[in-house]
Amino acid sequence: VDTRVRAGNWWGNGEPIFMMAVKHDYLIPAEQDPHRETDCAIRNVHIDGVTCMGENAMGIYGVDGNIREVELRNIDFTRKPSKNLPLKGNVFDFAPGRVDFEVPEDCGLYIGGGADVKLENINTRAWKIIHA
């Protein structure tokens, strides 16, 4: 996998591996707001044996622990320089959601929002793995 940041209105921001489980229904009138019966949005995902390069960090981001039983194994990641990242900001792309999150500059993999993720043999070189 080799990703890059594209200028303009383009979904994605150079994240080679990215999972998000955030609210996207902000424009729905209150009376039509969907009733959520499950407390889990992403579950039982296993990614194994991926070599990737990207202009942004990898990320797994949920809300209130709604990502569970995710496993990343044997991931080899190289973060490369980007001409376009300053144009869009050092952020993950949560479109069409409205999450505003700046990726730490020294980050290779960010796990947030109470996500339940197991890691095994993850090589991010000098970039940090942040499990917040």
Which residue ranges define each predicted feature?
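Extracellular/periplasmic carbohydrate-active domains that bind, remodel
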Residues: 1-132
